[in-house]
Amino acid sequence: MNVRRLIPAAALAGAVALGATALTACSGASAGTGTDGKLHVMSSFYPMQFLAEQIGKDHVKVDTLTKPGVEPHDLEITPKQTGQLGESDVVLYLKGLQPAVDKAVAQSGVKNVVDAAKLTKLEVHGSSGHDHAHEGEEGHAEGEAGHDHSHGEAGEDPHIWLDPVKYAEVAKGVGTALGKADPDHAADYRKNTDELLGRLTALDTEFKDGLKNTATRTFITTHSAFGYLAERYGLDQEGISGVDPESEPSPARMKELQAVARKDNVSTVFFETLASDKTAKTLATDTGLKTDVLDPLEGITDRSQGADYFEVMRSNLKNLQKALGSK
């Protein structure tokens, strides 16, 4: 079983300082606002959009490069979006998740760029929670079962928003960065950030309490996006594919998962809403398991089990409790 990660208080406090350094190339000047009087923020995809909206509220106009229903990993930037990116006051993105965005941001010339990957510590997670590499360990069973994880630096997992504690660290940094870009409204950004942190703390408590006592600690999912969540709450994630949802599992990996399902009394194979459920259903049929949704929250659509981050995360919690046999 994964060892629950303990985040030192100093690391949590450090997110505020990181927010200042993550706002790059500011030249000591604020971003200014558009003709509508709002700070124009371009976000890379939904979790970044949600933070900007919750922290900026009425003071910001938030657009996103990844439209609802688009799988973020596969995003291609259009010329129109490139132009919009260059005209933004602030760009908020997560380096390592979307190569096309990384390239466009680097070429945009925008002075106020906030990289969420610099606001918390990224880790390496494999497809299997049983041989997961923890913080400070050298090496990793990279390419396990034929998977090639190309995200982040040295295969780091970018799915930080699925851990409410790490997402809170990012929120702190975003609040600090928006305040630096728009100092006239810095007090409101601090207030809104504090409100959001309170909600994320409550969500963390719900997950801790809701997953404390379960019949099994192992879950199988098509997309290995839940490494941070699993580690936070003492669970074992077994991914059919790696952190890239489009990668195909090898026959050996499918056979291994069948053995894991029997050994760990797994009842459910999870799939997501933005990618094909074919592989999940194949494995479920072969092993006599059920299927259900575990949403990596990379976008909100009419198929999502909730209208925003908090609603979908609580749906994920309920689905995990049911699958794991919460007592």
Which functions belong to the PLM regions below?
Residues 2-327:
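Extracytoplasmic metal-acquisition and chelation regions
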